[in-house]
Each structure stands twice: as structure tokens, then as C-alpha cells.
Design a protein with these regions (language model features):
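Charged, solvent-exposed interaction patches on well-folded alpha/beta domains
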Residues: 1-45, 57-70, 77-81, 85, ...
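Extracytoplasmic beta-rich repeat domains
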Residues: 53-55
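Extended, alpha-helix-rich binding/interface surfaces that flank or overlap catalytic cores
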Residues: 48
Length: 248
């Protein structure tokens, strides 16, 4: 008899537990529906942060379809995926700010160079060699030009540009600006002539010929002479010879 009573007691306990769980689940659904219907939790505001060149209204419109949606029903990853499709966005974080606001923080890909293709068109690329899109709001983007005689078919927005000459220019450029930050804005163009890397200095209009050997010493000599002695406008400055500067 005691065993039968114990079994019936366990059965009642499990039945009661199931009823309680079902009641909680039902109550949760009712509460969720109630919250979803409350206007206070409908998304009303979208805040955009971190953009420098990409137009704020453009970024706002990418998240605008979620206006009026209950904030509890929004998956932030769904919003983030809309932004990752843009070539200029390197990273994005979407946060909920209760009761009715979402905050979109973007990290832009910023152009380092314009690459000129064989047809003469310019394409911005970032520090990772990714080709960026062009739009009217990037009109103030002022970047050094890279002329490596590349075919238009090799360039696609959102894709990484692979070219050994371009890799060499990146290496040289970053070494140069470590020596003098002014060179970020002082260089107007990089190009190859007779398999030698050249660049044009904006201040003097001079063409400077470089070699990879002892690049730091070449750049230091050029900067010192330019700032203290100056060069005749549009001269050619050959830095390939150790300890010498040849002016043509």
C-alpha cells in the first residue's frame, strides 16, 4: 500500500509540475503579446555613430525598415547584415536602447590611395587593399594616386586588389610616413618608370626616384634638402645612389 501511495504521489507531483510549466508558458506568451502591442516599445529612434564620410541619412535609411517594430522582436544581427553588404563598412555594432531606440555604430573603411586603371578611371582602396565604392558624399576624399597600369577588369568594388607593385607601394608609403607624417598629404602620385618606383611631391612638383635599398636614408635626405635648400620646381630627384642626391 505504501508503494502505491508513493507512486500516486509522484504522479500528482509531475502532473502539477506540467500544469505549472504550461501556465507559466501561457502567461509568458500573453505577457509578450501585451508588450509587443505597447507603443512604448515600438522602435521610434535610430542613432548613427562613427561615420566620417558615409552620409548619415544613407545609413539611417538602411535601418529605417525596423521603425515601428517591437524592440523585443528585433534581432540586432539582422540589422548588422544590412550594413556589412556595404563596401565602405569594415565593422558595425547594433545595440538596443530601451524602450524604443537602436544605436548603430559603424567603423568605416577609409581610403588610402586612388588606383588609376588603364581607362583613366580612379578607384579608392583602403589599407587592406579592398576596393571601395564611389559616391557624391566622398567628393572631399583627397588621396594619393597610384598608377600601376592595371586593367579595369581586375578591379571590383568590395574585392581585394592583388598586385605585387601595389604591395610594394604600400610598404614604401608606410615606411615613409613613419619618418615624416607630412608625407601623407605631400605625395600626389606613385608610379613606375623603367621598373623604378617614383613619386611626385606636391610642394615642389618634383619627381623623386626611389630604390628599396636604404629607403629610410633616401627619404631623410630628400626631406632635409627640400625643407632646408629647396629644389627647382618640376625637377627630377634621383635618390638611388648611396650618399648622393642627383638633381636633373
Amino acid at each position: 500500500m505504501d508503494k502505491k501511495r508513493k507512486k500516486r504521489g509522484k504522479s500528482r507531483f509531475f502532473l502539477l509540475a506540467i500544469i505549472i510549466i504550461g501556465a507559466l508558458f501561457f502567461a509568458g506568451n500573453i505577457a509578450k503579446k501585451h508588450f509587443n502591442d505597447l507603443a512604448i516599445f515600438k522602435i521610434k529612434h535610430i542613432q548613427i555613430k562613427g561615420n566620417r564620410l558615409i552620409d548619415t541619412s544613407y545609413l539611417y535609411e538602411m535601418a529605417a525598415p525596423f521603425i515601428g517594430t517591437c524592440i523585443f522582436d528585433v534581432d540586432t544581427q539582422d540589422i548588422e547584415m544590412r550594413y556589412f553588404a556595404h563596401s565602405r563598412i569594415k565593422d558595425v555594432t547594433v545595440q538596443k536602447s530601451f524602450p524604443a531606440k537602436i544605436i548603430v555604430s559603424v567603423n568605416e573603411r577609409r581610403g588610402v590611395f586612388f588606383v588609376r586603371d588603364q581607362s583613366g578611371d580612379f578607384h579608392p582602396i583602403d589599407e587592406d587593399r579592398y576596393v571601395l565604392d564611389k559616391a557624391d558624399w566622398y567628393i572631399d576624399e583627397d588621396l594619393p594616386l597610384v598608377n600601376i597600369d592595371i586593367h579595369r577588369g581586375q578591379i571590383a568594388v568590395g574585392q581585394k586588389l592583388e598586385d605585387s607593385r601595389l604591395d610594394h607601394i604600400y610598404d614604401v608609403f608606410y615606411q615613409m610616413i613613419e619618418l615624416d607624417k607630412r608625407l601623407i598629404t605631400d605625395i600626389s602620385e606613385f608610379f613606375y618608370r623603367d621598373n623604378q618606383l617614383n613619386f611626385i611631391d606636391i610642394k615642389s612638383g618634383c619627381r623623386i626616384i626611389l630604390t628599396s635599398l636604404n629607403l629610410d636614408k633616401q627619404v631623410e635626405r630628400f626631406i632635409f634638402l627640400r625643407d632646408n635648400q629647396g629644389f627647382k620646381k618640376n625637377s627630377t630627384i634621383d635618390l638611388r645612389f648611396d650618399g648622393q642626391v642627383v638633381v636633373l
